[in-house]
Design a protein with these regions (language model features):
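A short, internal acetyl-CoA/4′-phosphopantetheine-binding micro-motif in the GNAT/acyltransferase core
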Residues: 81-91, 120-123, 247-255, 284
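A structural microfeature
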Residues: 65, 149-152, 232, 299
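Conserved acetyl-CoA-binding loop-helix of GNAT-fold acetyltransferases
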Residues: 92-109, 249, 255-268, 291
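A conserved beta-strand-loop-helix scaffold within acyl/acetyltransferase catalytic domains
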Residues: 27-54, 59, 65-76, 202-251
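Short hairpin/turn module used for nucleic-acid contact or packing/dimerization
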Residues: 255, 260-311
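Short amphipathic alpha-helix that is part of the acyltransferase structural core
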Residues: 1-43, 50, 54-58, 63, ...
Length: 311
């Protein structure tokens, strides 16, 4: 007879074991390939500014499933399930259900009244559940979660020199220079101004994502400025090396062509790092990315929520 499943809290020394399990349990090759980055952003990095709990499911001595959850840094009554991964041969055996039930209890102990199966920016690996992880969608519905939003990524093809995503920006940069606008790579010394600009102009958590893009391996940021005044930025790699974003242009500079230049500078960096495609994450302006980089909608995510029963 199979050993029973036990759920225990994970300790930081188990990060390598969690990465190894995710490499085997994440069905989509692009996710499995970035398992180390995914675990890093959702656990050690996220724990720097929020409560994060890791749970492991064991059958006997074997780790067969993991869950990472966190409390919203802006609303302590909201918790997020950031990752659930179960080995293929352990699915449909109650492992995911047991992990999620324990996560709800752990989050409730921390004052959470509503749980989201959705990204918790600025430290997230997906906006929600990729629809191709169909068993996870079915499990969410069976456990009483309701879908309340849909999000999508766009894919930029970096696999060949003539890709629209890799078009030269030299002529556009010359035109901008004639107007006194400089475009360059951001450096760590730029972070105070960049994060203040992102926070004041766009709000949300973009300041945190920009901070996670500068001075880190596999990440980067480019900016546009005039007379020391920031006009826009584009970043990549904050959540995952293959993901682009966020990007923002000051309202006064919209229509200047800054956005397309910054975007393609980042995409060229990603190609130089060996990527043959980039994910433009949690996209808003679909027509802009389609026109500027030939990007297409590809990954689609369902975001779920559930109000926990009163104690």
């Amino acid at each position: 007879m199979d050993a029973e499943i036990t759920i225990t809290e994970l300790t930081p020394d188990l990060v390598p074991a969690v990465v190894g399990l995710c490499e085997r349990a994440l069905d989509l090759a692009e996710d499995a390939a970035e398992a180390a980055a995914i675990v890093d952003v959702l656990w050690p990095r996220a724990a720097a500014d929020r409560q994060v709990v890791g749970l492991g499911a064991r059958r006997g001595a074997d780790l067969v499933g993991v869950l990472l959850c966190s409390v919203s840094p802006t609303d302590p009554g909201v918790g997020h399930v950031d990752l659930v991964a179960v080995l293929p041969d352990e699915r449909r055996r109650g492992v995911g259900r047991a992990l999620l039930a324990r996560a709800e209890a752990v989050l409730a102990e921390r004052g959470v009244s509503e749980v989201l199966l959705a990204g918790n920016p600025p430290y997230y690996a997906w906006p929600g559940i990729d629809v191709r992880y169909t068993p996870a969608v079915c499990a969410a519905l069976a456990l009483g979660y309701r879908q309340d939003r849909t999000a999508w990524n766009m894919t930029a093809d970096l696999s060949y020199d003539a890709s629209l995503a890799l078009r030269s920006t030299e002529a556009a940069e010359r035109r901008l220079a004639e107007r006194g606008i400089t475009v360059r790579r951001a450096e760590p010394a730029d972070l105070p101004a960049l994060t203040a600009f992102a926070r004041a102009t766009f709000g949300g958590t973009w300041d945190g994502e920009v901070a996670g893009s500068v001075g880190r391996t596999g990440a980067g940021c480019h900016l546009a400025e005039r007379d020391g005044e920031l006009l826009g930025f584009a970043a990549y790699g904050s959540s995952r090396p293959s993901w682009f974003g966020p990007m923002g242009t000051a309202p006064a500079a919209e229509g200047s062509g800054i956005g397309g230049v910054l975007l393609r500078r980042c995409l060229r960096d990603q190609r130089a790092a060996g990527l043959d495609r980039a994910q433009i994450g949690w996209v808003g302006p679909v027509p802009f990315y389609s026109g500027s980089a030939g990007a297409r909608i590809e990954r689609v995510f369902f975001l779920y929520r559930r109000t926990l029963p009163a104690a």
